[in-house]
From Swiss-Prot:
GO BP terms: protein refolding
GO molecular function, one term: ATP binding
Assigned EC number: 5.6.1.7
Main function: Together with its co-chaperonin GroES, plays an essential role in assisting protein folding. The GroEL-GroES system forms a nano-cage that allows encapsulation of the non-native substrate proteins and provides a physical environment optimized to promote and accelerate protein folding.
Annotated organism of origin: Mycobacterium kansasii
Name of this chain's protein: Chaperonin GroEL
Catalytic activity, as annotated: ATP + H2O + a folded polypeptide = ADP + phosphate + an unfolded polypeptide
The protein's assembly and partners: Forms a cylinder of 14 subunits composed of two heptameric rings stacked back-to-back. Interacts with the co-chaperonin GroES.
Amino acid sequence: PYEKIGAELVKEVAKKTDDVAGDGTTTATVLAQALVKEGLRNVAAGANPLGLKRGIEKAVEKVTETLLKGAKEVETKEQIAATAAISAGDQSIGDLIAEAMDKVGNEGVITVEESNTFGL
């Protein structure tokens, strides 16, 4: 039963991460899996589950605070292109994404679909 609960939790983490950020699902899944595994191990060893939960919540707050301190706004077309190029692993795709974002604006939506045509 615990394995099923853990699997459902990890699935939910991946879905929520994808919905909110659109990226990072692998990292979130690995972290969630480690938290579940270590949490169950600690509970089996006698740790208080509520104490573990509170500790995890405090750690999440601290990590979030630290990440937000180091975060930088991506504002210019060049910054968008550079960030997108890193994510895509391809500068030309980064440039295309920056161009599309420039055209639709901050509130616009860009839909990317896989092509079935060779070379496109």
